[in-house]
Amino acid sequence: MASVWQRLGFYASLLKRQLNGGPDVIKWERRVIPGCTRSIYSATGKWTKEYTLQTRKDVEKWWHQRIKEQASKISEADKSKPKFYVLSMFPYPSGKLHMGHVRVYTISDTIARFQKMRGMQVINPMGWDAFGLPAENAAVERNLHPQSWTQSNIKHMRKQLDRLGLCFSWDREITTCLPDYYKWTQYLFIKLYEAGLAYQKEALVNWDPVDQTVLANEQVDEHGCSWRSGAKVEQKYLRQWFIKTTAYAKAMQDALADLPEWYGIKGMQAHWIGDCVGCHLDFTLKVHGQATGEKLTAYTATPEAIYGTSHVAISPSHRLLHGHSSLKEALRMALVPGKDCLTPVMAVNMLTQQEVPVVILAKADLEGSLDSKIGIPSTSSEDTILAQTLGLAYSEVIETLPDGTERLSSSAEFTGMTRQDAFLALTQKARGKRVGGDVTSDKLKDWLISRQRYWGTPIPIVHCPVCGPTPVPLEDLPVTLPNIASFTGKGGPPLAMASEWVNCSCPRCKGAAKRETDTMDTFVDSAWYYFRYTDPHNPHSPFNTAVADYWMPVDLYIGGKEHAVMHLFYARFFSHFCHDQKMVKHREPFHKLLAQGLIKGQTFRLPSGQYLQREEVDLTGSVPVHAKTKEKLEVTWEKMSKSKHNGVDPEEVVEQYGIDTIRLYILFAAPPEKDILWDVKTDALPGVLRWQQRLWTLTTRFIEARASGKSPQPQLLSNKEKAEARKLWEYKNSVISQVTTHFTEDFSLNSAISQLMGLSNALSQASQSVILHSPEFEDALCALMVMAAPLAPHVTSEIWAGLALVPRKLCAHYTWDASVLLQAWPAVDPEFLQQPEVVQMAVLINNKACGKIPVPQQVARDQDKVHEFVLQSELGVRLLQGRSIKKSFLSPRTALINFLVQD
């Protein structure tokens, strides 16, 4: 037993003294801990009745490190256990946590602690989405290297997370800007390139003509001007890297049907992808009969009718008319604004080898997000009119049989097939030849990942004048970022300035070549990070397949709803791709999603739109006004930000109220998916403060009852007291059932807290005799503390330390020599699950108890049936017959129906 006492520390040593013949009541002696004079039980051996702010601080100071060390000792290596992978979206290391961070990480921490108590093998990892524009801006503005700025911020934010008492799986920490992570981002990019899913084409960028540099959208103000130079931003075509996400559109759209837990988010994903009814096909381009080496990709919703093509149409804004194409002059000479224009450029279908003209359409906007489409008169009246107007030849390729079946004609090997069969066969053939054929929508675009930035993952491609774009050999990864001494924010891509880094040898021919100087969009880094968490230190591959297959999919993914479209789409894309590469067995990465709401602060705004600080506002009148000018202010609730002067510093509120109080406030103030209006004067904060006080008071009453010198003897309870204890037993089981459901199904942690508050209220009303002699009271009190532990780990740890030292306990199924967070989650007693055939339904009339009647179990939850059952009973006939009943209210949980009667 000695190792047990050593592991559990001071309060266990007190218990040992009692078990070894000490007195049968708690000794209220004060132990002096070197360097501290605390007033809490764990430090002094003396229970204090008062639960003050100082007590809360002392409790959290005492338990903070102990809980952290406790969590670090729990092994994650036992693969025989069922697993639970809870993941909160990792933060950008901006340098300071905000309340939104506190909310999402409090939720994930609470769920992780709960699942550990259920006996699950749990990981709750944390890392840093560390590449990105702010670090580069800081380098320009403050003359700091992005690496230094980022690492400093990570160090500070890690300390902040630690001060919040959050127990992450820190041994799994990842940082996307470190070579040991982005090596594998580059590896996955090369796999995409080899699969034909990464390619280059021209695309528009924001161009600053003064600084001669590309700007991110965030660097362009509302007037279309550069953030630094103030110059009017231009749109310019540059050759950019894309990932062909459209190749997985249909698979990802179909897979949504297998995600029943994605409530609210599935619709957003489906809308982003669009209706996958067609595909893109590739064409080579000729002018005046000469091949140009250029390609054009165009969309059709009816690829089965491709042999009936009359033309390929492009919009007036197409890149061929505005970029660096060799066809630009020929196309522009043919352009007549406002008219459909036939051009001398011919498009050769790479699947069918048909040659058709390119037409510039009069209308600027095509369907969806298209800028090119295939004209097929057999399936489009609009295409028929255009072909006839311009005198274009085409074939009718669809025949309708007498029974209404449509079959193909004049369509090579597809002739005679039904349209449905031809659609499948033709798109499959196109995919096999890598000339298109991926079923997608007319609105989804491929993912542009090029960024003309320094602080991002280098794209592992070498440009050779002989071999063309060539991937860096896998054994030569990572391609690390060169050390650039200064950043000006001007000129071309920063990496282009590092000439020693740019100039290299071609991996194939060994001739002179140049590295790609664009870096990847940071969304690429975060599109696969959930895989790396499963095997974060693997030096040989992004992750081990067997390890990833054990932990994946993520059981619960928590993050802001603002990421419910793009980030989730890209993450799903990477997961589908890795599945097809035989890297993982699961296609979808996330089982359940919890998109938490915002934390909003109150704002005060002048009619001019200027936001005021709270100190500038006069709140003494009926409406807020500007303290100086007395102008009326617009008062709103908005997402917290510095510019709106409505932010709250997490460290300040934790210092003021304590960690557990802020945790409980965040979890109790609103359901996780709803916004929280941050106002500590509302009922939520006083409510959770009162609840902590009630938990403390309940424990005090129990300790005092058992320390009174009287032995607990259940047989001394009267029938009335036994009935009271039975009610507590029923209430406890009901709460266990409902709280467990909230933790596992709907994650309504606010409702879980409400249930626990109800149980604590019921326990508060227990008679002194029940407290002393009833095992039901003891069990319900202990179950309450265990269920509250994931929500408020510090105060419940202290309370459990007090409960553990109570002599002559009646409940043997708790592990009294372990802390509350190491207890097994309470289970509903089997007897409670055996529902009785008859429920004793309490009948109230105008809120006054009038008796009980037996009601069959099968109707006890049906409002109308219980209502009628009561009316036909002897009690109902006697008390309700002939009276005007306005309404009745049924409470199935408490077996009570209340009739409101007109007197």
Swiss-Prot record:
Coiled coil: none annotated. Its main location: mitochondrion. InterPro entries: aa-tRNA-synth_I_CS (IPR001412), aa-tRNA-synth_Ia (IPR002300), Leu-tRNA-ligase (IPR002302), Leu_tRNA-synth_edit (IPR025709), M/V/L/I-tRNA-synth_anticd-bd (IPR013155), Rossmann-like_a/b/a_fold (IPR014729), tRNAsynth_Ia_anticodon-bd (IPR009080), Val/Leu/Ile-tRNA-synth_edit (IPR009008). The modification Phosphoserine is found at S711. The keyword Ligase applies. PROSITE patterns: AA_TRNA_LIGASE_I. Changing A430V: In HLASA; decreased leucine-tRNA ligase activity. The modification N6-acetyllysine is found at K68, K236. Pfam families: Anticodon_1, tRNA-synt_1, tRNA-synt_1_2. Ubiquitously expressed, but highest expression in tissues with high metabolic rates, such as skeletal muscle, heart, and kidney. Belongs to the class-I aminoacyl-tRNA synthetase family. This is Leucine--tRNA ligase, mitochondrial. It comes from Homo sapiens (Human). The gene is LARS2.
